[in-house]
Structure formats: structure tokens, C-alpha cells
Amino acid sequence: MDRRHLYFLLFLLCTIQAAIGQQRSFSIKGVVKDASSGQPIPFANVVVWNTTQGAVTDSTGLFEISGISPGSYRLQSSFLGYKPFVTAEFRLANKDIFFPIELEEASQNLQEVSVVASPFRKTAESPLGLRVIGFKEIEKSAGGNRDISRVVQTFPGVASTAAFRNDLMVRGGGPSENRFFLDGVEIPNINHFSTQGASGGPVGIINPDFIREVNFYSAAFPASKGNALSSVLDFKLQDGNKEKFSLRGVLGASDIGVSANGPLGKKTTYQVSVRRSYLQFLFDMIGLPFLPTFTDAQFKIKHSFNPKNELTVLGLGAIDDMKLNTGMEDMSEKNQYILSYLPVVKQKTYTLGAVYKHYAGKNLYSVIISRSQTNNKNIKYKDNDESKEENLSLNYRSDEIENKFRTENTFRLPFIQLNVGGNIEYAQYTNDTYQKQFTSIPRTIVYQTDLGIWKWGIYATAIYESYNERFTASLGVRADANNYSSDMNNLLDQLSPRLSLSYRLSDPLYINANIGRYYELPPYTTLGFKDNEGNYVNRTNHLSYIRSDQAGLGLEYRPTSYLKFTAEGFYKHYDRYPMSILDSIPLASKGTDYGVLGNEAVSSTATGRAYGLEIMGRWYNYKGLTFIASYTLVRSEFKDGRNMDTYLPSAWDNKHLFTFSGTYSLPKNWDVGAKFRVVGGAPYTPYDVEKSSYVEAWDANNGLYYDYSRFNSERLKPFTQLDIRIDKTFYFKKIMLGAYIDIQNILNSKYKEQDVYIKTGKIINPEAPVYEQRYELRPIAVSYTHLRAHETRRHL
């Protein structure tokens, strides 16, 4: 960032600071309800966490805490016969707010032990691998840029890739092994310009202003959340303000947006947002070879018919358009290399969903319906020259449409809670592909796909808590199937049992364990791949669900309500993973490039394993301080098709991950934060320069080929990065103004990749036959500094 720009911003902050008069105070209103029945709880205690300010609910469960200054808060609620509860963090800005609280019924003899309310949560179903991420961590995390995928990289077990990507590699798993839920509605991806068949991209889609909290599972996945092998991100969204209308504007370093929320009558609330990027101008100014533009929109409407029935309708959509910056004046060799292989990408995606909940005594019935569509287009021409049709090397167009119906039911009995449910889905996958390839000879892949798949599944979970809640156990089972082929249509072939245990050794010390078997359906790109004769190659190859057996054991120590330490060991075994027939490597080591993953012939023969140890300390918002310090020792290995007797490192075998991230709240609404991250060197496969130099080979691929006979035989150097952030929030009579400076990689550390080659355009043997002609290739060094600065102003 230019120093004059920085000085001007600091001067502006101080000038606005001097113009502020005395802050007003507001009220926090809400209702306390039984989590099972939805009935209001009268005379419950509600206090602002870590303060003495509070209130008692009236006979209808309503409460009001007045005289609260603007800022970020949590509420703590308790009542005899219920577990004490600390809410997610929320912001009180320039108006009163309404905040609902749900309390879970406690065991009959819980009053015999001392239970301290804490913002840290774990469940009987997921005592390991569950991290709850609050609003403030998303909002003010250094280097996070208010993007949940970047914030998650702070937690143990999560590796990251090169700059400008949000890929999630959790506990040694690949980027295609994650699932995402928005208030119970499954969404296909959470990133713009996402890699089809995986999950990564450069920028998040979800508006962070909508998020109340995120449950991040890296193990012990709930039986209701199927089709995941590495992680589940379960987003809990805020409701619209029940009291007053509010408007918010966001001006960032890369986008501009506006959102609104408020009441629609006495029983209905809403929130809606629209965002538009101007990254193409920024990237053009700093000389990047690609120019992305994105637009996204999001909404949520919630209607309460009565205390026993409620309906939520939500939607999320994005339009992405990435062009190549071929007209750059200063065309560096690195930019030439990127332009040589990067396709033009156009994507459209949306999800519409509805969640209906009915409270019946101590039971809860839920019905979830949704429809999602992802349209993806990738086009590439040789030397980016569109003047000649023969220069076309890739024309890929596909649609993924999913229609889903799911029911979830919770029954509460003495000491036992039962969760049962099922789902039925219909997916439509269409594809029109033209792609040039080169193996030992050039060839062209041309096919059209129109594939319809019915999918179904059932699950059940029984949760037990001892009379004093010293011991909890959860036994779950899930089964999935579909009509793609006879290898997948039997529920018993995908039977997925899981068991979780937790025991309190003493008041602050717990031992937790989990073991389970999990299944994941390969991506539609793999299911729908055809050969030139129109045959579903992978159906013939007996493609099946990917299977992973996982186990974990951990200790959790909570000396106070705001501090905890955890140590968790894990082991994951993979089986039936798709193995590329062309490359003889597992698809598990692919998926962090722009484009498509899985559109090739495979066999379900790859096996692998990931294992390691995670250590974490977390201090949560006490006396203004919040921090996470974590270290992960992880190994991720697979067997390739050339040597089935030896495990080789996967692309996510970083070995060592260390992160420290913290924020500190200063007087007068200042916040400062920092994040320091060390990522161990990732393995890589050297390029096959000889093969790549053939004219027919290079022109087909528009770039280099890997030498898979030396699969991941080399390793990059470790990478370190320091990010810092300064926030200032101003509260006026009717406006809240927030500004921040977020400087990523302030030490200008370089992420060094393996050297690459570019063609000079010269054929070194023009007299040879066409199939023997070679380009002259020149090596260049590639590194990324990822130095970025952000400023944002928001108005309410």
C-alpha cells in the first residue's frame, strides 16, 4: 500500500473520531425458548456474558436488557432444569435488536454438579473435530478479508495452497472432500470461480454479514450430514432484525455491496444483499494476467406461524466471468506462462431452499427442500488466438442441477435422544466437451452427456447422556445409494456406522474418542464422463462410492470458561478412491487449479491414508483478547497405479502446519490483530520437459506435462506469512461506520514453486516430421508474494 494512502486513511479515522459526540445506548430484546418444544421459558436468567447487566424473562419468555452501549456481545442464559448456554457473538450497532435463545433440557440430576456456561461447545455426536467460529472471528481476523474459507485456515489440520485460492485441505484430505450447509440447506460450493468437482476458488460467495456462527467439523461428522470425508461447514445465519429496518453498505478493496434487513409484519423477518466486484480493474492495474469479475446475491426470509411452526426460505447465487489479460503492456515471462494454460472461465450458480420446522412436545420435525444449479464454461485457444477455429483446444460446457428433499426428526426420551431422517434427490448432469489431448499421440475427446441420477439415503443416531452428564455416547448409522449402476444401488453396500464417546475425567478435563466409516459419491464430472463412442466409461469400470474409515482420540482441558486446550490424534484410511487411468495417480492429489476435476476415465482402485496430531490453545474474547494457537503434524499418502506396494506422499502432505491468530480490543472501539502462519513444503511432481516440448503435445495442452513416473518425488520449501489488521468502528446516532486496514504478507515472504518452462515459439527441428517436431522451451522461476492491503467502510 502507498504510504500517502495509508497516512490519509489514518488521518481520516482520527478526524472522524474527533467529530463523534457521546454514544447512545440501546436495548437487547429477545425470547428464551425450549430447544425441543419451541415453548417460551418464563423467569429464565439472561445476562450479557462476562458482565452483571441482565434481565429475567417474563411469563411469555420475553426479556429486555437496556442501557447497552454499541459493540459486540454474547448473552448467557440459564434456568433450573436446563443447560446453561452462551450465545453466538452479535453486534449491537445503532438500534435495538431482537435475539432468540434456545435452551436444551438437562439431565435430571444435573443440579448435583457445577456446570459453567462457556462459548466453547461440543456435542455428544461430535466431541472431536468440532470448532465453532463466531461473528467476530470472521469479521476481524487478520488476513481473513471477511472470507470464511480463509478464517478456517487458522484452525488445526487445515492446509492452504498458493495465493488467490481458498481451497480447503483438512487433515490430509483433498479439496473435493468437503460439504457445506446453509441453515440446513446443502449448497454445492462457497467460492466464486470454483473448481468443478472440488470446492476451491479465489473469493467466497457467502455474505459474512449474514453469518451468526459456523460449525466447522473436521472429524466425527453427524449422520445427518452425508457425503463428506474431510470436513463439513454448517453455516448458521442470522435472522432479520425484528425491531427495525436497517441498511448496510460495504466498500472494499475488491468489491462493493449493499444489504438490508428488517421486519415484514409481526411474524416475518428478512435480509437481502447484493455484491459486485471490481477486481478486473485492480488486477489490470497491478499487472495480473487474468481479469475476474463476479456478482453475488443472497436472501433469507423467516416466518413464524406460531410458537410451534416456522418456515425459512433462503437463496444464494453468483455470476462469475474471468477474462484473460492478453493486452498487457508489460508481459513478464511469468504472466506468459499463466496465460499459456489458463482458460477463459464463466460460471453461474444458485441455490434456493426452504426449511419447515414443527415443534411437537419434546420432539422436532423438519423438512428441507432445495434446488441448486451450477453452469460452467471453460474455453481455451492455442496462444489465445481465436482467429482460427483449429486453434481451439478446449470447449467445455456443463450443467449440474440438484433437486433435494430431506426430512429430519428429533425425539427426546429420558437420557436418550433419537435423530432419524432420510433424503431423496434427483440430479441432472449435462456436458458438451471438445478437448485436445496428447498421450503418445494426439487425440481429441468429443462427447455429450445427459445423465439423470436418483439418490436416496437414510440415517439414525441415538445419543445417551449419563444422569450427571459425566459420560456421553452417540451411536449413528447412515446408508446411501443411487441408480447410477449396480455397484451403487444397494444401501447396505454403503452402510456407514459411527460411534462417539466422551468422558469427564475431572471438572475441566475430558477424554474424547470417535470411530466411523464414511462414504462420498464421486463428482458428476466423473460419473458423466464418456468416450468418443458415447459409452459411460466409468460405469463400465465399476466406479463406486469412495470409502474412508476414520478414528480419533483426544484430550480437552478447560481451566476457565474462556480458555481451552485440545490435543487430538487422528487416522484416516481411504479405499475405492478414483484412480486416473491416463496418469495412474489418484484424483485425491488433484483439484486446486482453475477448471474441472474428474472429467476422465478412472477406476475405483486407489488407496491411501492420512494421520497426525493436532494441538490447539484457544482464548475467547476475555478482557478484549481472542487468539488461537495451533500446531498440526500430518502425513497424507496414497498408492499410485505404478507401485501398489508403496505409499507415496499426496499433494497435501505438508507435514507441519503452525498458526497463531489473535485480535485485541482497545478502548474507543479500536481493534488490532495479527496472524502468523507456517505451512510445510508440499510435495510436487517434476515436469516431463521432453514430452512437453513436442509441438503436438504442447499445442494440445497449452502447457507442460507432469512426469508421473516421479510422482511427488520433490518437495517445495516451507512458506511463512504474517498478516496484520487495524479496525476502527464509529457509532453515530443512526449510522455505524467501520473501517479497517488488512495487510497480508507484510514481510513480503515468497512462495516458491518449481521452475516452469515457456515456449519461445521457435521449432528447433522444423525439417523433422510433424510428430517429431519440438518447441524450444526456456525455464523461468515462479514465486508469489501475495502482498495485499484492504480497506473497508460500512454504513448501517
Please provide the spans of the model-predicted regions:
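C-terminal beta-signal and adjacent terminal beta-strands/loops
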Residues: D575, N669, R677-N702, L716-Q721, ...
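Periplasm-facing N-terminal accessory domains of Gram-negative outer-membrane beta-barrel systems
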Residues: G21-E112
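Gram-negative outer-membrane beta-barrel transporters
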Residues: E465-N468, Y571-H573, T592-P686
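Face-selective signature of the C-terminal outer-membrane beta-barrel domain
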Residues: K302-D320, L342-M488, R504, L563-T566, ...
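Predominantly transmembrane beta-strands of Gram-negative outer membrane beta-barrel pores used
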Residues: R179, E213-S224, S230-Q238, F245-P289, ...
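Surface-exposed extracellular loop regions of Gram-negative outer-membrane beta-barrel proteins
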Residues: N191, G327-K334, T430-Q437, D507-Q550, ...
